Design a protein with these regions (language model features):
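Short, small-residue-biased leader/transition segments that mark boundaries at the very start
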Residues: 3-8
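C-terminal beta-rich recognition modules with glycine/proline-rich loops and embedded aromatic residues
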Residues: 11, 19-20, 26, 30-130
């Protein structure tokens, strides 16, 4: 199968327009998806001392179903490491993030995928220990 790459420079009202579509045309979006620890705006007092995990443009969350034993004790730190893994049995497949923290490890899923298995706690903003 032949693949072509297109660079779209012309835009109509802010949108890229490709007028001549064929049934075999495919648009592939390829972007870096690094895992990062991000902070909230400092004006959000409720998130002081907490951080979230983001992979590319996706925000991740922690669900109790994946972290039942240590859900309320999990913390992030500058030394936290991350591993991504594909899990096929949630919403036809998602990338999870596993952390290895000082005291315990945790599993995070994309925010869009939460509340699709079992009722329980969910958290985006995780205590951060510098």
């Amino acid at each position: 199968r032949r693949q072509r790459q297109m660079c779209i420079r012309d835009r109509e009202k802010g949108y890229a327009v490709i007028k001549d579509w064929k049934s075999q045309d495919v648009i592939a979006l390829d972007m870096d998806m690094p895992v990062e620890i991000v902070a909230a705006d400092p004006h959000v007092k409720e998130n002081f001392g907490k951080r979230a995990i983001q992979r590319g443009p996706l925000v991740y969350c922690m669900e109790e179903i994946d972290n039942p034993e240590y859900f309320d004790q999990i913390q992030l730190s500058p030394s936290t490491t991350f591993q991504t893994a594909f899990v096929s049995d949630i919403l036809n497949g998602i990338k999870t993030i596993k952390t290895n923290g000082r005291a315990q490890s945790a599993t995070f899923i994309p925010y869009y995928a939460w509340d699709n298995r079992k009722a329980g706690k969910m958290r985006v903003w995780i205590p951060y220990n510098e």
